[in-house]
Regions:
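Condensing-enzyme catalytic core mediating Claisen C-C bond formation in acyl metabolism
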Residues: 1-12, 16, 20-25, 31-37, ...
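Active-site nucleophile and cofactor-binding loops and adjacent substrate-binding regions
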Residues: 65-70, 91-93, 128-140, 159-168, ...
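Active-site-proximal gating segment of KS-fold condensing enzymes and close homologs
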Residues: 102-159, 204-223, 324-338
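Glycine/charged-rich beta-loop-alpha catalytic/anionic-binding loops adjacent to active sites
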Residues: 54-61, 123-134, 151-161, 231-238, ...
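A glycine- and small-residue-enriched flexible loop/hinge segment at structural boundaries
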Residues: 35-86, 90, 100-109, 140-155
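Claisen-condensing/thiolase-fold acyl-transfer catalytic domains that form or cleave C-C bonds
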Residues: 165-180, 242-246, 250-265, 279-428
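Glycine-/small-residue-rich "gating" segment that lines the acyl/pantetheine channel
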Residues: 120-132, 173, 192-259, 397-402
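Short beta-strand segments
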Residues: 4-6, 99-101, 162, 187-193, ...
Length: 428
């Protein structure tokens, strides 16, 4: 059961998205929190005061070395715990699994280079100790899991999974299996990533002159155009030609039904299954457009328990990449047949930017909120649906009424990795 959701995502008006109400206010309107400065990007404007208000008392010896990833991951965790009415500092999570998904390494680079460039012959002892603490906390992908484990004083499983943009989706599957087999009663899953705007700008400049060379080496299973970041992302729109990135963190609290019932927790819904597949190509950067392995992941999730005709909504994973839209459309046709035209399938990546590892947790949180509200959020920035869509992308800026008990949420990783999560209302 999902009993708590918390966020540290780009917002509007200088305030991050932190709570379920904040998230719904943005997603239900199809609003975009992306800002343009050479490239479009979703920034989390988390002030020191906001952080200190939610996380007082952390020893400065550790906190002054926190990266943005640490800060975002800790804030989304305490927001999710507050939503679930659990106190991470009073032992409520002492036996919980604290699981983190991380896709990128941008937040780790500065600490890594600081140690690499330090001169042991001239550095002072106190400065050397500061570098050591910063490095221990920040140079590996386990950075956020380390500080979350410390905050909660957890004695349970505590580790990081890196599967690109499917990282937290994979961790949700692991958490579900841990709870189902009785290993833990509570699992807290966070997806967090930070993307360097400087790096994105430099990539954009490098790629501007590289298209002709790329045309000469590309294979049929690679997109015809190199990525672009300088126009607004429009998933499922006929004008889609760009991907925008964003930073941030999303945390969900998962519990066994018995544990949640004993303490009278609010139930958003449940994670019924999760499956991961790969396209099987020899090219490490490509994916195929038939969607066959996405179909396989969905069918593993459904099993004999749920029929596809019982799933009227899918939270799509499109980031504006036309290849992603193509394999999603083909997969939907294979799964739903003539019923595909009635399927509602939307993406809110245009609200916050493509944020990597948080996407799995964000998809679950958004979908369960839609289920609870009985409304499907529109696809952000989609105004003119693409011609090749086999489903209804819910264009515009208004929600669509839908009473539903089952849904799917999709996430992908570069190289053809596909994740599908089957979600249900609390009582199914």
């Amino acid at each position: 059961m999902v009993t708590g959701i918390g966020f540290c995502l780009p917002g509007q008006g200088g305030r991050p998205v932190l709570t379920a109400d904040d998230l719904w206010n943005v997603a239900s309107r199809g609003a975009s929190c992306l800002m343009k400065d050479d490239v479009y990007f979703g920034s989390v404007d988390l002030s020191d005061a906001m952080f200190d208000e939610r996380l007082p008392g952390i020893p400065p010896f550790f906190s002054r070395h926190y990266t943005a990833a640490h800060r975002f991951g800790l804030v989304s965790l305490v927001e999710a715990c507050a939503d679930a009415e659990l106190d991470p500092r009073s032992g409520d999570l002492s036996d919980a699994a604290i699981l983190v998904g991380r896709g990128g390494v941008d937040a780790n680079i500065d600490s890594y280079l600081s140690v690499l460039r330090a001169d042991p012959e001239t550095i002072q002892a106190a400065e050397a100790m500061e570098l050591f603490i910063a490095a221990e906390q920040a140079v590996t992908p386990s950075d956020v899991a380390l500080v979350q484990g410390a905050l909660t004083c957890s004695k349970g499983p505590n580790f990081t999974v890196s599967a690109g943009c499917a990282s937290s989706a994979v961790q949700i599957g692991i958490a579900r299996r841990m709870i189902a087999c009785g290993e833990v009663d509570v699992a807290v899953v966070t997806g967090v990533d930070v993307f360097s705007v400087k790096l994105i700008r430099n990539i954009q400049n490098l790629l501007r002159g590289a298209q002709n060379t790329y045309d000469a080496i590309r294979s049929d299973d690679m997109p015809s155009l190199l990525p672009s970041f300088d126009s607004l992302m429009r998933p499922y729109d006929r004008r889609a030609d760009c991907i925008n990135h964003g930073e941030g963190s999303v945390t969900i609290v998962m519990e066994s039904r018995e544990h949640a019932s004993r303490r009278g927790a609010h139930l958003y819904g449940q994670v019924l299954n999760q499956a991961t597949t790969r396209d099987g190509l020899a090219n490490p950067l490509a994916c195929e457009e038939t969607g066959s392995e996405l179909v396989a992941a969905v069918r593993r999730c459904l099993g004999d328990r749920v029929g596809i005709d019982q799933v009227p909504y899918v939270h799509g994973g499109s980031d504006g990449n036309v290849v992603v839209t193509a394999f999603e459309a083909n997969a939907v046709t294979e799964l739903y047949g003539s019923g595909a035209r009635d399927l509602l399938m939307s993406s809110q990546e245009g609200c916050f930017g493509h944020n990597g590892a948080p996407a799995g947790c964000l998809g679950v949180a958004l979908t369960l909120l839609m289920m609870e509200h009985g409304e499907v959020c529109p696809t952000a920035n989609c105004e003119e649906p693409a011609d090749n869509l086999t489903f209804d992308p819910v264009p515009g800026v208004r929600t669509r009424p839908l009473d539903f008990d089952y849904a799917l949420s999709f996430n992908y990783q570069v190289g053809g990795v596909k994740s599908a999560i089957l979600l249900g209302s609390p009582d199914v």
